[in-house]
């Protein structure tokens, strides 16, 4: 059964107040959340990746966007937020709901949602500390285009089990790259 959009919206509205009161503890909270998300994503695999080798695809992960040395902290947090938001959107679709074991999908979505809350709290806090623009628009656009390519691939492959397996592996890869960005952020603190 698809995740109820109205339920997700209710959770979003109810937790919005708490976002503003949270402090930014990104290095610990996001790193742990990212590890939990990776574990859940690994558990979601239903078919052997080896049976889907013919479906592999290069989605053009914008690796340079995960090189935190080129960003200020607020911009790096914004890139992380966009990546998690796009992942959440991808796995909140009806097609995604049909592809994965429901309890694992719900846990994964909940983990992503919590990471979004943490990142939003950090953006709110960091914007007050820095006079730089909130986002590096080119970086955000690169992340969005990356996810558009993933969505187009799924559509072209008619959301087949192998297509979802390839996407699952790709999202694990992108979450791993975001871990590198988090390490750089920790050094900047």
Curated annotation (Swiss-Prot):
Task: State whether keyword Nucleus applies.
Answer: no
Alphabetized, the UniProt keywords read:
Antiviral defense, Cytokine, Disulfide bond, Secreted, Signal
Task: State the signal peptide span.
Answer: 1-23
The set of disulfide-linked cysteines is 24-122, 52-162
Indicate where this protein resides in the cell: Secreted
Q: Which Pfam families match?
A: Interferon (PF00143)
Q: Which domain of life is it from?
A: Eukaryota
Keyword Signal listed: yes
GO CC, sorted alphabetically, is: extracellular region; extracellular space
Listed GO molecular functions?
A: cytokine activity; type I interferon receptor binding
Its GO biological process terms? adaptive immune response; B cell activation involved in immune response; cellular response to virus; defense response to virus; humoral immune response; natural killer cell activation involved in immune response; response to exogenous dsRNA; response to virus
Where's it mainly located? secreted
Describe the function of this protein: Produced by macrophages, IFN-alpha have antiviral activities. Interferon stimulates the production of two enzymes: a protein kinase and an oligoadenylate synthetase.
Q: Which family does it belong to?
A: Belongs to the alpha/beta interferon family.
Please identify the protein, giving its name as recorded. Answer: Interferon alpha-17
Identify the species of origin: Homo sapiens (Human)
Gene that encodes the chain? IFNA17
């Amino acid at each position: 059964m698809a995740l109820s959009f109205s339920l997700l919206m209710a959770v979003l509205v109810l937790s919005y107040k708490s976002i503003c009161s949270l402090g930014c503890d990104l290095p610990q909270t996001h790193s742990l959340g990212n590890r939990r998300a990776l574990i859940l994503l690994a558990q979601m695999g239903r078919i052997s990746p080896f049976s889907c080798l013919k479906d592999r695809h290069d989605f053009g992960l914008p690796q340079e966007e995960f090189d935190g040395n080129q960003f200020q902290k607020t911009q790096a947090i914004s890139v992380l937020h966009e990546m998690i938001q796009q992942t959440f959107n991808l796995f909140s679709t009806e097609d995604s709901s049909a592809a994965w074991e429901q309890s694992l999908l719900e846990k994964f979505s909940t983990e992503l949602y919590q990471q979004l809350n943490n990142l939003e709290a950090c953006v709110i806090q960091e914007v007050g500390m820095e006079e730089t623009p909130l986002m590096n628009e080119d970086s955000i656009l690169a992340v969005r285009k990356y996810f558009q390519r993933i969505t187009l691939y799924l559509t072209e492959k008619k959301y087949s089990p192998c297509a979802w397996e390839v996407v699952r592996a790709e999202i694990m890869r992108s979450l791993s790259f975001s871990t590198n960005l988090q390490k750089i952020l920790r050094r900047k603190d």
